[in-house]
């Protein structure tokens, strides 16, 4: 279930809330024209603009997410940047006064073509993805389900499901599981379990052999 959220400024605060179907926004969170799933938690001073966040996904604060689609059960660490702003390197000046013209009193309209390009290059992140502290996901990048992005990584290219990437620019380090196990987990689509199914089965997610035997034979 998604909730349409447009809360430019939120002042709620609780360091350890008990989550519910209603998205929880910590103090200073700003969510603009976005859709948040149930059991989601938006950290302190996080900004989310024109994005979709799936059920059970959370961030740890000071995160920036623009024009992105993020799946369910994702874990986003502190200070992550997803689809950060670009600058027009083909212009004489890269300064944003050339496209944020209203702010600098230069025009009555901003450069909508510039912003349209950014919207046309969304980041798409699968389910159960862990993004480490201060990682940056550049515009247009797709990250597969189950992937891990190491702390401080700058992701410039697509990441395969269940792949671990690290470094600047990010490069593959290893896969979390064998190809056959990855295929079977993907086919199980456990992230689509209903709430009653999750309450009944969540312990099985703690053991790969048990999970594979029951849900991904």
Regions found by a protein language model. Give the residues of each.
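C-terminal segments of enzyme domains that contribute to small-molecule binding surfaces
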Residues: 1-10, 26, 95-137, 169-217
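Flexible, glycine/small-residue-enriched loop-and-beta-strand segment within the central core
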Residues: 13-15, 19-139, 168
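Conserved catalytic-core motifs of eukaryotic protein kinase domains, centered on the activation segment
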Residues: 86-88, 159, 175-177
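Short, glycine/charged-enriched secondary-structure capping and boundary segments
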Residues: 89-91, 163-164, 179-181
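Short-chain dehydrogenase/reductase
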Residues: 130, 148, 164-165
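Catalytic-loop Lys-Pro-X-Asn motif of eukaryotic-like protein kinases
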Residues: 133, 151, 161
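A generic "structured core" feature
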Residues: 144, 148-150, 154
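Acidic, glycine-centered active-site loop in nucleotide-sugar glycosyltransferases
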Residues: 161, 166-169
